[in-house]
């Protein structure tokens, strides 16, 4: 079976250095991939590159489309939903329901269809009580959940999640994890919280020096409950 997403020898340069250096990656349908790395190593750049928001060399293929121009990437962004680190970058409509309906409207649904879909989704996610709220007045945790609802409303095949649980309190964290765990679609998740990644993902890679290293998140329960990371192959292996 062909992967949903495939990157082949993709490079992104910034200030004279390669942030991504002839990097290759594939993501299968339903697969949940943890993307791990130090601050500033290029994890966000990689997510942005997948959806055409960073100029890059190499080959990006998604959903059977070999992406060569902005028109191609617009088609990709309808199927690969990107959740930004900062929900304020994603939410710009007056009310929650307007923010959630924005994507479906852009995909061609009528106003009535978009509102019905968005209200139903908010209800299913346990967020129906927020529908009429002014987005600007929400708490940080509520904004993050609403931004997730907004990308899910586009009914994507892949979620690209950039620090989705960062700075959430316990209540909103558990709600976020419950929502993500219930999704049956592929994901790439960037997070510094290995405990969260172990719960949500089934494969891990580490971004270092512009390359991806295959890795494994696990715990040795007989010694420690703390999740830790193992590199499992040599650098340069096909991913």
Swiss-Prot record:
It is a peripheral membrane protein. GO terms for cellular component: ATP-binding cassette (ABC) transporter complex. ATP binds at residues 37-44. Its main location: membrane. Its EC number is 7.-.-.-. Keywords: ATP-binding, Cell inner membrane, Cell membrane, Membrane, Nucleotide-binding, Translocase, Transport. Residues 5-234 form the ABC transporter domain. Coiled coil: none annotated. It comes from the Bacteria. It is found in: Cell inner membrane. InterPro entries: AAA+_ATPase, ABC_transporter-like_ATP-bd, ABC_transporter-like_CS, ABC_transpr_CbiO/EcfA_su, ECF_ABC_transporter_ATP-bd, P-loop_NTPase. Belongs to the ABC transporter superfamily. Probably part of an ABC transporter complex. Responsible for energy coupling to the transport system. This is Putative ABC transporter ATP-binding protein BAB1_1388.
